[in-house]
Amino acid sequence: MPSNTSAVPGTFGFMAAIRAEHPDIQSKLVSANKIIPNSYFKVYPTLHLSYKLSESRELQLNYSRRVRRPEGDELNPFPEYADPKNIRLGNPYLLPELIHSVNIGYQWQNDFFSLLPGLYYRYKYNGFTAITEIYQQDVLITSQRNLANDQALGADLVLNATVADKLNINFTPNAFYNQIDASNLGYGQKRSTWTWSANFNSNLTVGPATMIQVNSNYRSARLTPQGRYLPSFVLNMGLRQEVLKKKGSIYLTASDLFKTLRQNTRLNSPELIQRVSTKSNSRIIYLGFSYNFGRTRKKKDLQFDNSQ
């Protein structure tokens, strides 16, 4: 059961929480008539400390331990054929990913913007990674495995700003040094690189009933035990027009406006050299209408589908 306590002695702030779980999972492989047990007890604490420097400035220190569990398709060993030469399948022995993170930040805010730069360290145990192997002759098989560990040391920034009560901006760049250890998978040397990403979101109100939204995401190259994922970029746009005395709304959205969203993977290991580009039909134009029969609710941001 989660447990929370908080206290604010003077200009200091304190908040703590703890959550415990004890899953007892029995996975049955029917075709092999085999039971795979996965039973464990884990505790996930969270700690937040703050020191108020002034009405607009604050120092923060945070620690958390989190879990990311594998999804069904990552566990399902039934093969999925992307084409006759490439097979993907889940790994029923895949363990949950455990994440320890510590970050220190400085928050500065007023009526027009808030700024939160920070430094952080993140340690992942049993991190998920895709491994591609030669199955037979020229047929490849890809499945999920657990890394020994994945470490990141970096800096990030969260900027929120409002301009003339018409334009809201959110900008979150992130840069870090990443090191992965896949020695448990037979890859002896640790691999490391610098990488970065950035998210940009904006909402522009035009007149009393029109809102335009733009959001974009960029990620630089990221490591895998066998190579790397190459950089990716996506831009989405949308418009919402309120009608019928604000009881109704017309929505027009465009996901992946410039058709740049794709997953490019480059593998370069002693046993395999490969470059794969996966591209779905990600440019989706959506036109919709909604009508509220009851009390007017707070308008939500537009939704975009950037799944690959």
Spans of features found by a protein language model:
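Repeated loop/turn-to-beta-strand initiation elements of outer-membrane beta-barrel proteins
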Residues: 11-14, 56-59, 112-115, 165-169, ...
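C-terminal beta-signal and adjacent terminal beta-strands/loops
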Residues: 243-308
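Outer membrane beta-barrel strand-and-loop segments of large Gram-negative receptors
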Residues: 1-2, 95, 108-110, 114-172, ...
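Transmembrane beta-strands of outer-membrane beta-barrel pores
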Residues: 9, 20-26, 63-69, 78-79, ...
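Surface-exposed extracellular loop regions of Gram-negative outer-membrane beta-barrel proteins
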Residues: 1-32, 40-46, 55-100, 121-141, 166-177, 199-221, 257-271
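Residues on the lipid-exposed face of transmembrane beta-strands in outer-membrane beta-barrel proteins
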Residues: 3-7, 20, 47-51, 104-108, ...
